[in-house]
Amino acid sequence: MTTPPFLAGERLTASALNHMYAAADASNRSVTAATMTPISSQYAIDAFDAAVGTTYRLSCWGVGAQGSSAQTLSFRANTIAGSGLNLVTIANSFCATTAQFRWFARMTTTCAATGSGGTITGFLEGLVIQTGVTRPSIQFNSEWTGSAINTATNWGIEIDCEWGSVTGTPSITCNGTLFERLG
């Protein structure tokens, strides 16, 4: 069980608050390519910011349109300075051809070891649902452990996506991104 950042009755100080923060933006980013491309905004993490147990969470959401020829859609968590983490591919049946859809993706990663031999573990999750349809959403998730990251240099995180093919002109747009550092 983890200890909460503040205990009941504890005095809240500026030095305690600097361990948790968030940043958000509403920049639109679109992906129409069949190659991994950032769909979320990219957030930098300073060298030596991560300690063992430091957790970062990146959420993004938006809309899209399936092409006139149904295509698969893949998401991937990425460490920018490191490498792409586990890839999740959604079958092309997630949405009818030419139909609109809504989507959400969240990456959560925790530092397991620091320095030039640092490692992170984490999870990528999300959902996609066709607009105006009552059928269940398509959920996706992926986990990684022991991914190498040098926490002694600047690094960062983003969520990428790609289409299986550009045939039929599919598109996906991010309408907002939220980055959080959680203690």
Where are these regions (language model features)?
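C-terminal trimerization/auto-chaperone modules of long, extracellular attachment fibers and adhesins
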Residues: T2-F6, R11
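Surface-exposed molecular-recognition determinants
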Residues: G9-E10, L17-G183
